[in-house]
Every structure is written in structure tokens, then in C-alpha cells.
Regions:
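N-terminal alpha-helical segment of soluble enzymes
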Residues: 1-44, 241
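Conserved C-terminal structural/oligomerization subdomain of aldehyde/semialdehyde dehydrogenase
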Residues: 167, 204, 258, 308-381
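Residue-level signal for inorganic ion chemistry
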Residues: 14, 36, 58, 116, ...
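Rossmann-like NAD(P) dinucleotide-binding subdomain of oxidoreductase/dehydrogenase enzymes
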Residues: 70-213, 342, 365
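A structural signal for short, well-ordered beta-strand elements
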Residues: 7-8, 40, 150, 207, ...
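Residues at or immediately preceding the N-termini of alpha-helices
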Residues: 11, 29, 44, 211, ...
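Long amphipathic alpha-helix in the N-terminal Rossmann-like dinucleotide-binding domain
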Residues: 19-30, 42-68
Length: 381
């Protein structure tokens, strides 16, 4: 019933409600950020940054309803004209991960709703409070009941979404195994499926680079949000003779990286999301040692006074990692950076292209030709 009403609402009226939603989010911005910190654990500045990224999509969605125009072609055949119109799909669904409980949902539902669809959001069971609050704020902005719905649960709820014939489209962000599961079962039930899986993202560090810039970039890319993001650069590829100095500079930075509770203004990295995830990340560090990688910085046993039972781990740094090791092949999803050494640029490109997956990559160099060649040869994204 909600779809029947919302799908025929004039575009300008939809746009006004979404614009009001944007204003309501801005009014409650700090409250939402604190919800993320309290439930997920990321530091306050990271929480605010992720909210801002999501809000940008809401702002963009405000203009979408009036851009949905059809086409007309005259006389495509004898006395035949052709019209095409753009119609909503219906009830769409989104399944989102724990690491960005506001930003990733806001990539999905504002755009779908702007186009006249209704939406079911299944957030992570680890931190659902912010999505639930967003639903309340959307209603406060004037969205009719039933247009945006949040359902909590685990695999049982996911399967119900995938099997429901009244849901024609599903979006997913999360791990690669579950992305494959979503694709397989969604396609089996004739749904449109959009799924973003996990990754192992590389950063190539060339001998001619500005090393300070590379190290500062890697500190944010590898350890920001405690490494709990699909775009985290968890592999640094050291080309030529740059490896020793790169490892030395990163290890020095890690010595002063402040780990602590998210609302502490001095904290640069917060805890991991759950005890189970902490044990998983620690297990990967244990595995790296067994596999023969050199653990240069070990953050496994970090202790914070007053937070002894918190899910904290310090930044970890491995050197002499090889492509046959599991810590290189698999997504750790924690503050762990692996340094792989290669002899030249071509070997670096081959290493990245041979990896099973990757959402993004980068190169630090002063040579414009190297940057251009890198962009054209890399098969990532």
C-alpha cells in the first residue's frame, strides 16, 4: 500500500521530503555520530566524517525525482510513435555491514526512495541503532509510513528478503562470501542484485616518492577506522630499495598512534566492533607469525587503563610478507598492514592484478609516466 501511494507522488513533493530529511539529519548530526561511536566504537571524528559522506548522497538524492524523464521518438514506423517512461521498481531492499552503520545505508535508501520506490533496510545486527534513528528522522521529515522500513536480524531475515517475490531488487555491501551468496540466491529468485564484497587493497610505494606523504597516507588508509573498511589499504608494495625506510617510518608512527575510546578527543583509533572480531584479527596476526612474516609492530596485547575488557588492538605491521601467505590473500578487516617487497614497477602491477580481489589501489611516485601507466594497467575496482 505504501508503494502504491509513494510511487505516484509528484516528483517535487518527493524532493521536498528528502530535502527536509537532509535538514533533520543536520539538526541531529552530533546525536547520530555519538550513536555510531557508542555502538560501533570508531572515534568521533571518523563517525562524523562517515555521516558527512552519507549526507552528501541525501543531498544529491534531493534533485533526482525531477531528473526522471522518459523519451519520445516520432514515426519509428508507419504511423507509429514510441514513448518510454521511467517507473519505480517497487519494494527495494538493502543489506548493510557493521563498519559504516549510517554512511552505507545512506548510499542506498535515499536514492531508491527518491525514484519512487519503497525500501527495506536490513542493517548489521552488531550496530542497528543509527539506522533505526534515521528511520525515525525520515518520518519526522514527512515520509509516509511504510516507505522506509528497518528490519533487524541475521541470516533468517536475509533469506526472507532474497526469497520474497515482491522484492525485485537487492543491494548489499559486506564480505565476499556473503556477496556471492546474495548474488546466487537473488538471481535464483529473479532479482536485480548489486553487491560489493570485501577486498585486499594495495598501495605501491615507488623509490622516487615523497616518503613522508606516502607514510602519512598509509597511516590513514591502513589504520583509519581500525582497518574496518572495504577500502582499507592493507598491503604496501615496496618497490626497489624503499622497503627498509618505509617500514622504519611506519613503525615510528605506530609508536605514537593513540588508541582509546571513541569519544576521547585524543584517540586516533578506537576498538574493534565485537569480541569475536577482535579474536579474528588477533588470530590473523598469530597466523602471520606462523607463516614466517616478520612482525615489526605487535599491537595484540595493548592494555588501556579502565578499559581492560574493551575490544582494543593496536596497529600491527608485518614485513617480508609473500603472496603465498594467507595474511596476504585474505581480508583481515583490522589495523594490520603487510609490506610486500618487489624488485620493480612491473612486478608490483603483476602482483596486484594477480590477486583475487581488490576494491581500489594507489601509487606514490613523483613520475607522471609511472602514475599514468599504473592507472591504465591496473585491473582493480
Amino acid at each position: 500500500k505504501a508503494y502504491e501511494i509513494w510511487s505516484i507522488k509528484p516528483p517535487l513533493q518527493r524532493a521536498r521530503i528528502i530535502f527536509k530529511f537532509k535538514e533533520v539529519i543536520e539538526k541531529n548530526f552530533e546525536e547520530l555520530a555519538k550513536l555510531i561511536v557508542s555502538e560501533h566504537g570508531k572515534v568521533f571524528e571518523d563517525a562524523k566524517g562517515s555521516l558527512t559522506r552519507g549526507l552528501e548522497v541525501v543531498e544529491f538524492a534531493c534533485g533526482i525525482p525531477q531528473m526522471l524523464k522518459g523519451d519520445f521518438t516520432e514515426n519509428v514506423g508507419t504511423n507509429i510513435d514510441s514513448w518510454s517512461i521511467r517507473q519505480p521498481l517497487g519494494v527495494c531492499a538493502g543489506i548493510t555491514p557493521f563498519n559504516f552503520p549510517a554512511m552505507v545505508p545512506m548510499w542506498m535508501f535515499p536514492m531508491a526512495i527518491a525514484c519512487g520506490n519503497t525500501f527495506i533496510l536490513k542493517p548489521s545486527e552488531k550496530d542497528p541503532s543509527c539506522p533505526l534513528r534515521l528511520a525515525e528522522l525520515f518520518k519526522e521529515a514527512g515520509l509516509p509510513d511504510g516507505v522506509f522500513n528497518v528490519v533487524n536480524g541475521d541470516k533468517e531475515v536475509v533469506d526472507a528478503i532474497l526469497e520474497n517475490k515482491d522484492i525485485p531488487a537487492v543491494s548489499f555491501v559486506g564480505s565476499t562470501p556473503i556477496a556471492k551468496y546474495i548474488y546466487e540466491n537473488g538471481a535464483k529468485n529473479e532479482k536485480r542484485v548489486q553487491a560489493l564484497g570485501g577486498a585486499k587493497n594495495h598501495c605501491v610505494v615507488m623509490p622516487d616518492c615523497d616518503l613522508d606523504q606516502a607514510v602519512n597516507g598509509l597511516m590513514g588508509a591502513a589504520y583509519g577506522s581500525a582497518g574496518e573498511r572495504c577500502m582499507a589499504q592493507s598491503v604496501a608494495v615496496a618497490v626497489g630499495n624503499i622497503g627498509d625506510e618505509l617500514v622504519h617510518q611506519i613503525s615510528k608512527k605506530l609508536e605514537t598512534l593513540k588508541v582509546g575510546p571513541g569519544m576521547d578527543k585524543t584517540s586516533e583509533m578506537g576498538p574493534l566492533v565485537t569480541k569475536e572480531h577482535l579474536e579474528k584479527v588477533r588470530g590473523y596476526v598469530d597466523l602471520g607469525v606462523k607463516e614466517g612474516a616478520k612482525l615489526v609492530v605487535d599491537g595484540r596485547d595493548i592494555k588501556l587503563q579502565g578499559y581492560e575488557n574493551g575490544y582494543y588492538i593496536g596497529g600491527c605491521l608485518f614485513d617480508q610478507v609473500t603472496k603465498d601467505m594467507r595474511i596476504y590473500k585474505e581480508e583481515i578487516f583490522g589495523p594490520v598492514l603487510s609490506v610486500v617487497r618487489v624488485k620493480d614497477f612491473d612486478e608490483a602491477v603483476k602482483l596486484i592484478n594477480d590477486h583475487e580481489f581488490g576494491n581500489g589501489t594507489s601509487v606514490y611516485t613523483r613520475d607522471g609516466d609511472v602514475g599514468r601507466t599504473f592507472a591504465s594497467k591496473i585491473k582493480i575496482g
